[in-house]
Every structure is written in C-alpha cells, then in structure tokens.
UniProtKB/Swiss-Prot annotation:
Protein name as catalogued: D-lysergyl-peptide-synthetase subunit 2
Gene Ontology cellular component terms for the protein in this record: cytoplasm
Enzyme class, UniProt record, top EC level: transferase
Recorded superkingdom: Eukaryota
The gene coding this protein: lpsB
Similarity-based family: Belongs to the NRP synthetase family.
O-(pantetheine 4'-phosphoryl)serine modification, residue list: S835
PROSITE patterns associated with the record: CARRIER, PHOSPHOPANTETHEINE
Assigned EC number: 2.3.1.-
Region spans: Condensation (C) domain: 910-1299
Molecular-function GO terms, alphabetical: ligase activity; phosphopantetheine binding; transferase activity
Lineage of producing organism: Eukaryota, Fungi, Dikarya, Ascomycota, Pezizomycotina
GO biological process terms on file: amino acid activation for nonribosomal peptide biosynthetic process; indole alkaloid biosynthetic process
Pathway: Alkaloid biosynthesis; ergot alkaloid biosynthesis
Domain notes from UniProt: NRP synthetases are composed of discrete domains (adenylation (A), thiolation (T) or peptidyl carrier protein (PCP) and condensation (C) domains) which when grouped together are referred to as a single module. Each module is responsible for the recognition (via the A domain) and incorporation of a single amino acid into the growing peptide product. Thus, an NRP synthetase is generally composed of one or more modules and can terminate in a thioesterase domain (TE) or reductase domain (R) that releases the newly synthesized peptide from the enzyme.
Amino acid sequence: MATPEKWRKYLEDYIPCSFPTFLDNEGADSKSFASVLVRLEHPYGRLMSFSNNCGVDVAVVLNVAWGIVLQAYTGQDATCFAVIAESNLNIRPCRIRFTSDKVVSDILSACQSPCSEKTGDHDIPASHLSQDGGFLASEFFNTCIWGPMQGSQMTSETQAADMNRNALNLFDLVTRVEVPRVEVDKSITRITLTYKRGLMREHQALAVAKAMERAISEIISGKERLDQFCLLTSEDRRQMSLWNMNLSDNSDARIETLIHEWCRRTPSAVAVCGWDGDFSYKELNELSTGVKHDLRHLGIGPEVFVPILFEKSRWAVIAMLGVMKAGGAFILLDPAHPPKRLRSICDKVSARLVVSSVQQADLAAGLAGHVVIVGGEVATAGMAQHVGEHDDSMDCIAAPHNALYAVFTSGSTGTPKGVVNSHSSFLAAMPVYLKALELDNNSRVFQFASYAFDVTIFDALMTLVAGGCVCVLSNADRSSDLTSAIQHFGTTHLSVTPTVARILDPQDFPSLKTIVLGGELSASDELLKWVNNVRVIRLYGASECTVMSIQCTSGPASSIKTINYETGNCCWVVNPQNHEQLRPLGAVGELLVEGAVVGRGYLDDASQTSETFIEAPAWLQELRQGSSTVYKSGDLVRIAADKSVQFVCRKSTQVKLRGQRIELGEVEHHVRLAIPSATECVVELITIPDASRPPMLMAFVLSDTDASTSSITARRNATSDAVFAEPSASFRSQIASITSKLRDALPSYMVPSVILPLRIMPLTGTDKINRKLLRQLAAALSREDLQLYQAQQTTYRAPSNDIEEAFQRFFAQALGLSLDQIGADDHFFSLGGDSLTAMRLAAMARKAKFDLTVQNVFDHPELSELARHTKLVADESQEFPQPFTLIAGSKQGIVRDAARQCRLPSRVIEDVYPCTPLQKGLLAETMRDAAAFVAKIEVPLPRDVDLDRLRQAWAAVAKANPILRTRMIFSPSYGMLQVVVREDVPWIESDEVESQELVVVGRSLVQLILRRRPSTALFLHIHHAVYDGYSLPLMFAQLNNAYHGETLAFRPASAFIRYLATMPDATDYWQSMCQGLESPSFPALPHPSHRPHPDSKATHTVCVASPHAREYTPNTHVRLAWAITQAHEQGLLDVFYGTVVSGRNAPVDQIESMLIPTVATVPCRITLDVDSPVRKILHRIQDVATRGIPFEQIGLAEISHLGKDAAHACSFQTLLLMQPTAVEQNENDFFNTSTSDANYRADATYAINLFCTLENQDLSVTALYDGNIVSTDTMQRLLQNLGKSMQEIHAAPRTLIGDILKSLHSRL
C-alpha cells in the first residue's frame, strides 16, 4: 500500500497538473456535476488488438491518450493524473513525460510497468484520499481516468456507481471509458466525461471528450510522432474559420499624405506640444520638408535606413516625418543606450548618416560618417531656406511595400535584431488603432515611451494622422516628475506599461480619457484602479506586427491574462512543435498572426526571418486562395469559445520587463563575457510573490571557483542550500566591475539586478538546466538574503535628524520595506530600488514639500547624502498669502486710501487685493443698474429659533469667511480692489425689507434683515460679487454648523486671488477656440446697442435617465443639447453661446470650501458634424472644456480684446448655467436653504438665460428671457427641443447628430 510520501517521491519532478483552465465560466455553479458522452470511432476490438500488438494493457493506451489531452490543454510536457484500477477500485498516480525525442511506442512502454495490474506499490484506497483520510489528491492533480483492463473482472453497475461517486468527491473531472457487455469485437466504446459545472461548460466538456476520442484514434492508427497528432474537431475548425474569414486589406495610402491633409486643413492647430516648444501643422509641414530636401541631396530614398538620435524633443517628430518624406526608413535610437549597442545597430543598417539633435551631435559622429543636425538656430535657419520652394513632399517615391521603419529588439546571439515594418503594414493597423483609442483632432497624446520602443512611433504617427497633438515631455520630467508633466500637457491619451501605471493615480489627471497599457501583463488591482476613471485599452502585440495585433477594452471583471483580437487580422493557435497542426479551442498552443499588419521580417537575417515569418500552412491554404505570410509569435496561448485569448507563457527564453522585450540568451552571452571564469550561466526573470517588489532580472553563475564536484543525482535533487554559494568578499568586490561591464554593453533594463553565484547548476529529470527550480528558489529569497549579494555592505546607522527620518519613511514606502531595514547610510538601489521606484520616491518627497527629483536620487543614492542635498521648500499654493502681499506699493498708502473710501478707521482694514475679472464685470453692471446682480433671499425661520444664538452664529460665519466682510473700491493705480474689514456684517431689524438697498462702492455687500411681522423671517441681501451658486449652500451649511456649536475653519479668499495672478497666458487657447467664427449671435437683437430686459419666464422638465450618461458630465450633455437646439433654430452647424463654469477646478488648496465666487462666464463654441455620433461630439466638448480650465478666469472683457473673432464670440445673447445639485437637508437644519427666483433674476442679463438643474433623473430648465426679442411660442419650442435633444443624447450615444436634427425638424 502506498503512502502520501511515496506519491510525493514518485511525482517529485512533476508540477501539479490542474485542469481545466478556461476563461468564460464565471457565474457557473461550482459544486454540481454534469456529464457528456462520446463514442469511439473504432470498435473496442480494434483497441484491444492494437494494445496486444504493442504488448501493453488497454488501460495504458487510455492513460497515454488522456496524458496527451492534458498536455494539449495545460501546456505542460510532464502530466500526471489519477487512475482507478478496476480490479480493486484503488487509486494510483500516473505520470507521463512528453519530449520531442520520444515516439508514441516508447511512451506506451514506459507507462506499462507503473500502470500494470500486477503492481500495487502506488495504490491508495479512495477513502485514504478524502479530507478525513489524511491528505488530498489535489496536492498532485485534479483529474482521474478509469477504464477496462485485460484480465480483470468487469465491475458491476453498483460498484461502478459507488466508484464514480467516490471519484467525484476527490476530483474535478473524471473520464471513464466503458464497454457494454456485448460481443467485444463489435461493441462500441463510450467515453463519459463528468465535470464540475464551475470549471467548464457543456460545449467545453464535449470538446475535451472528443479530444480524448481523437487521441485514442491517433494512437491506434499507428502514428508515432506526437507533433503529428491532430486533436482538432470539425466543429472547432469550422468556428475558427468563421472567426478568421476576413483579412484586412492592404492600403495604397501614404502616411505623410494623410498628415499633410491636416497641415492643409488646420495649419494653425498645434501638431507637437513639447517641453522645448510647439509646432503648428504648418510648421510641421514646412520644417519636415526642409529635412526631406537635405536628405534627398544626400542620397536618402526607398530602402535606405536612417538612424535618428534625439533626447526627448519636439524635433524628433520633425526628423521622423522628414525621413518619411524623403522616402527612407527611420530607426529611432535612445541616446541612453550604450554607444557600443548604438554602433552595432548603425553598422547593421550600413548607415550613411545619422539625423541628430544638437545635444547628441558628438555621440552621433561616432556612429556614422555624416551627421545631419535637426533643431537649433543654425539647422532651423537652413531648413527655413526651403520654405516657399515647390513642395514635392507628396511626390510618391516610396511604395507601400517599402520599409517605413525598423525597431531593434534583443537578440539571442548577443546582437540586437532589427524588425522591419513597411508602409502597408503600418497602414493596415491604423484604422483599428484610431478606432480603438478614439483618436481625433482633439486628442492630446502623451509620448512617454523610450525612442527605442516602437510604441513611441505609434504615439507620434497615429496622432498626426488623426489631426491630434503629440505631447513630448523632457527626459528629466520622464523620470522625475511624470505626474506633473501629464497634467501640464492636458493629456487625453497615455500609453505606458502597467509598471509605470502602478505609480500613477488616476485622480491626478482630470483631462485623461484613455490609458493604454501594454508591454507586460496587468495586475487585476491595477486595472480596477483605472477602469473606474478612464477608458482602459490593453494592447497585445509584437514589433513584428506593427505593435498591435490584438487589442482589448477591459472592464472590471477582465482576466489579467485575457485579450481580445478585433484588429482586422487573423489569429490562429497551433501545435508549438508543428504549425501544420491546429489546436482545439481551449488547448494551449503557439499564437500565429495573419494579415496585412505582419511585418517584413528581420533585417539581413534570412534564417531567423524564415523561422518566424512563415508561408501559410497547408490548412490555411485550403481555407483561402493566395499566399500570405504568417508570423509565429512565440507566445503560448489558448483561445476560448467566446474568441477571448489567454496568454500562458513564452515558448522561448524571451521575456518582457517593464514593456521591453528581452532575449535572455543575449543577456547570458554578455554575462559570460563579463565573467571569464563562468562555466555555466542562466538569466531568468524572477517574479517575487510580494506585490510590492517588482519583477527583476537575476543572473545565476556557476564559475570554476565556486563549483562543487556534485553528482548528476545531487544536481537533480538540489535544494537552495546546495544551489547557492556564499557571497564571499571576493565575489562582492567583483560585482561593481561586472555590472559596469554589463552597463557598457547592454541597455539598463537588460542588466541583471542581482548576480547569484552557484555551487551547482540544478538539473531536471531529463538532465536539462532546471530553470523552473532556479526561479522558485530565487523568488523565495528575502530582501535580506539578496542584500548579501550586493557590492556594498554597510553597518546599520539609525537616522540622526528629522529629514533623515523622513527619507527613511520615503524609502520604506517606495521599496515596500520596514523602517528597521533601512539605515542612514543605505544605498537606495542596493535596497532594490530602480528608476520606477525612484519616481515613486520623488513623488512622495514632493508631496511632503521636499524639492526632490529622480536625478537627485541617482546623484545621491545614499539616504543620508540624499537627505543632506534635499531642501525643504514651502509650498505657497498650500498656504494663505500674508495680508497686503498681493498688490505692490506702499502698504500705508493702500490702507489709507481704502479706509477713506470705506469711511472706516485704518485699523480695521484687514487686507486689500485685486478684484477678480468676474467681480469687475458684475460691479460694472450694478453701477449701470442698481438692481443688477443683487439677490434678495428669504429664509423662513421656525418659531422656536433662538435669535441671539442665530446672530452669534452669523458673526462666526463672517469671521471665518473674509469674503462676507469685503467691500469694493476703485483705485486709480490698481483699478478695482477688494477690501477686507474687521467688522460684523450688518444685521438690520426691519419690517420694511424692500426699502433696504445695497450701496456697491465702499460699503458692505451683504445685509441680514430680520423681519418679525407678519412672521419671523430672515432676509439675505447679497451681491453676486461675494457669492455664487456653489458658495451659497456652503454659507448656509456653515451657519447651521455654527448655530449648533461647531467651530468654523478660517477660509480667506486670498489664495484664489493669488492663483489668478499666476494663471498661464490664455491668448492661444481663446484665439484658437474662436478662430473663423462667423455665425450670428442668437437670438438677434433689434439693434446692436439694445440692452435686453429679461421680463418673461418659462420652465420645462424632462426625464433623461440613461445608463450611458456617466461617461460625460451633465454639463457636457446640456451644452450639446442646447447646441443642437440652437443649430436647428438658426439652420447652422457652427453655433456659440455663453456658459457659466464653476471655477472650482482651479488648483487651489481648499477651493471647494471657499465662499468666494469662482464662477466665470465664457463663450462656448460648438461645431456640429451631422455624420458624427453623439459620443464623439460629447468627447470633443468635454475635452475643450477641460483644456480651458486654466484659462476660464480671464473674463469676457479680456477675451473680447484678443481679436475680432474673440470679440464676436463674446457677443452671445444666450447664457447657459448649470445649477449645482441641491444639497440634501440635514435634520438639524433650522431653515430651508432653497432659493427663490430672485437668484435667477440676479444673474439674468441676456436675451435668453437658461438655468438648468439635474436632480435624480429629471432635468429642470428655467428660462428668463426678453419677451420683446423672443416670443412665448418660440421659447416653449426651444425648451421642448432642448428636452428632446437631451433625451436622444442620453438614450443612444451612437446616434448621429444629423438624425437628431432631423427628428427636431419632424416635430415642426
């Protein structure tokens, strides 16, 4: 009788074999079982005859067949499972190893002895495998097979039923092969597969059962080679053929032609926005044409490769487009890579010249015989000479099949290999890429990727083809201040690796619409962090397929390894050892990509190209006529019945780290060169179970100095103590030298983080290097263990001051260490840091007010040195300005003038600062009309209110909020000023409420009037210069809190005033937004000098419930709805009107709780396209509004001074205002904070004033309008059309704008 220990010994070289692993079974019952049945193609007699001829039991044939099925579906070459012996109903393990050098007859013979009925050494009764019996079979496997054996007595039906129940208690999947009790030679063999519903569905179970039938049939047909076995069913073949019926078409278009069209249509639009300056589309065209002329004179044309060497710069885009116009193919080089590697790339392409920036000219001179400088004053002047010449940039000299670019990736021989992609392959990917990412001329795409990474090519060219803006950050910001750079550019689209996304916070990027994750697998928590904020696109692909061969829009439930292909190309899964054999759905195989996106191959490497870019297999040629090239990806995947693809692993030793492809053989080659004493070397990507520690490259080196004389058996049974050598002082002294040599030869991402010396190199049972064991042993090493192998070892010294203690905390958080693991003299990178964790460290320090960059971390990696060189700076944006610091000049003079105009003693003047543009405009209107922008709000009070307590509460609110104690004056030197005074807000008791009027200049702008008769009520007279719709509820909430005894925080408005003084220049934004505006304002005034008097009112409410509404703000929906309404009324597609923005998006600390009015009135221009869907226009409106946030406080007066078009845009006569959602009343609120029509009328100065409120699912619109300009019938029609437009926008975001306009027309 066997024991668990005996099983473990028997299966020690085998990893647990768990099956099934499908992708689409969520929500299924995980406990109940179901069965499917198939019949064997051949009679049982044929099976017996074959087994007799081979000298093996029938059970052995069945076991090997099941092993073949498991190998296909799990991807494991070593499979194991349970076998039920019919003679005694015991359970025994079966192990089968499939290797390329073994034929089927050898495998059958090897399985005969352990599975023989005469051998019971490994038998265990089923009861001993239960939970109560001591240990679980699932420790080893979760599938079981049982069937008839020669010479054994057939089990009875009762015994079979009992055994089946026992098996189902132990295993997730049971396969039974049974033969009816009839004449054996003629009987039909049945295969019954019983499975847990939670693990697979019926169609999947049926496919597995049919695969078992196919495996048995292939064995008894006499096939010897496993790579000739076909487990594919006709149903699976038919399904895959349907999925892959249509290929994407080749395109004859040219990328530079598509870009040139935008240069013609929108010459003034920004094409490239860089840290070093911007280029309009006109400048992009002219400067790249200049580069083209220079390159053509130097012999650049089709199939000539031109290396481009730039730091992150706007000029790199000019260089790329210039090479393309010249007809050549470009290669982007990263100057951070070792010169030796850059030279090898230039030598590989026989580079005639290098196009370089001024800064990289010296490095470029060492790479080729000629350097063309692009950028800088001299080079720019040279390119400018070509402006005005005949622009033959669209002359077609490069054909679609010609090379567009080459990307060099890691090569197993130690030399980078160049992947060549043509114009046609890039263009084939373009339509799907633009659609998937929703790129258009409003997109601002952040170019983060290294120039050595092909994603940067797509970021640039796809954006320009769409008419968008390429945003180029600096190298310094890329490593030190990524968050700020993304914010600065108003980024809408961001492509990064999941590793980089991990250190970013979605909440920091209000303008971001889409994040593209690629290069490596995403963790589920990372996806969830992003999918709730922006669209998440996960790209799967290879440089050989123009980056994107499969794309997926992920949702919260997406598997982190699941990808979907919807790219116009075709994907197939084949036997990894034989691409002439298709795999069944759900089985593991190598992914093949077919279609126009497939590149041309490897540069000057015919052998590698022929292995990877193959002619269509025979099965594919049967499907479609004509030959096509198919790319063998080297990725092992499985495709489910819903077409989703699950990545399993790499077929070869190629891995990806932080998005970069690494051929481990290349790294091993250079490690051997750096360590001459090395006899064996293995490099592996180690994934640490601790999520806070990122994956890292490790090198395992066996040298003649450390190697022990171990037997083959010892190497097969190696443990961590036996494998790893002690890190001697001699070894540590060499680490720095070895690392330096590797950095000279390899990019930083390919340099191993740790080099581990070995005593022995462990082997598998087949005497191959046991890479899996090395990965397992290395992953189990603690941080302390790894530190022993670092070049420097320091004695622990505790931090000696507050700054060092702060940096100890930063180190701990960035690296995922405890404080006691970090000393003052510890080295950041020795503790496991890298460039990404340095970015995280810098971000933490900046939040704590330390002026720290990633460059500082690299310059001073020791904790104490970094602390010593880092300054603690005051973040002024987080502090309130000191009084009288926001205007220049003599404080005494300013105070004296303020006191005189306010008729107050100088001692009560608390502060003076400029008025906002909004306040200036409101005060000007009130000087013309005393009632303009003055609200009179009645607040009914309960009878039991304590009036003294209420008065004290109001005094507390006024004390905490200086804006309520603010007066306005005019200074000849400074214009309109705000004066904060130390006084109580006027509290007047009078029954003649209407007789109390506000005096604007030099007097209080807030009055509280207590009326006692006929009922007690509180009246608030307040000028709009000191409140807005957002701050009014805040004020009443504070009054409630103070009445109930709460202490109020001090909230001065001066921080917002300081922000206004430092706003960026808004000229470009508003001029661009208003450019070419010719539509008349709406509604038309009787004559230009007419001042509207809104004396009429209309209301309308409409239900707008929709599941699609959350992607865009209610404000965006209302803006589009009114634009459609106005466009229909005017018969124009280019409309404009005024809108009021909250202003609360400004980057001012605590702005959400300030009572100062931050609203701003701005022109809103919307150009409709009848052929565009609603979603696209919504996206454009919200994007324009988001990009306008930094410029919205400039004021209408200033905007109107920016040119004729801008002045016309400010002449609107319709104002749209989205009211804040009503604040829910608290049970302790002693008055109702809702406001009356007086609020509306205070804001209404245009011909049409629309006040919109969205509560629950209802949009309520109140219109105050001038009845002499707009008739009642017209206003009602406008409101009804507004409601109809809102409903259609919400209901169907894919509806075309033209269809909504038609529906409004049909209502007439």
